[in-house]
Each structure stands twice: as C-alpha cells, then as structure tokens.
Amino acid sequence: MSEASTVKLQEPRLQDRRALLVAGLRRHYTPETMNEIPALWQRLPFGKIPSQLGHMAYGVLFNQSDPTGGFDYLAGVEVSGVSAVLGDLTYVKIPAQKYAIFCHRGHVSKLKDTMAAIWHEWLPASHRSVSHPTAGSPQMIEYYAENFDPQTGLGDIEVWLPLEA
C-alpha cells in the first residue's frame, strides 16, 4: 500500500484568493535534498522581516518542471511591498487565483503524505486541472496559520493547489 493511500483527505474547499507578495528564503531542491527544507525554515528571520503582514507563513513550491524532479521552494511571509525585501531574502508574487484548499491533519513531517494524496488520488478523481504556471508562479502553496508551532510541528496547515478557471 502506498503512503498516499494511508492519508484520508477531506474534500477541499474551493476558494478564490487575492494576490499576495511573499518574501523569504529560496532554494532549489531535488527529491534527494527535500529533507533539508526544515533547515531553510530555521534560517528564516520570522517576525523580523520589514513590512511583514501578520504571523502566518507560506511555503511556496514553483519551477517544478525540472527533469530531475527538482523544484524551487520559498519559505516566507506576506509583505506589503518589494522595497522591504533585504539581504538574502527574495520574493515571489502569487497571483489572484482559484485554489483547492486542503487541511493537513497531524505533524508537519507528514505533510508530504498529504501532498502525495492530493496529486495521486484527489486530482485524478476530481477531473479538475491544475493551473498551468507561468515561469516563477506557484504550483503549490503551504499555508501555516498563526497557531502553527514550529517547535512542536503542530497547528493548522493548509495546502493550496491552483486550479484552472
């Protein structure tokens, strides 16, 4: 039995989301190095980023067309403007979009299982299409609510999958 089939996904809510500007740390990962993503989060100066809006965090996955299975990942926060991005921080503009929004249940270390269930079970069964990304636009977004505790790895986490209109 695959790991994806052990995850019981609730039906997602479909929601139109406004555009966001997310600033943070960005790195390229491969399937072999994706276990290093938590180290990127540990380096993020959360709460100290100029013009940070709120206490939510975003993990933005994009440029996943790499033939090696690689992808770019940005660990960041919403900011009010680009001028606030300093040092080794970078930003990504997330366009207004319709999303299928899934609630992840459990520890953050099991998030990959939820994502696998979304891609390999829900998406084929839903007969929906993922939005074809333009260069640099997100292919999936992790949303960490204010109650997410990075020390325990628990709290509200959502996975946003951009859909074709």
Name each region found by the language model.
Residues 1-165:
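A solvent-exposed interaction/effector surface
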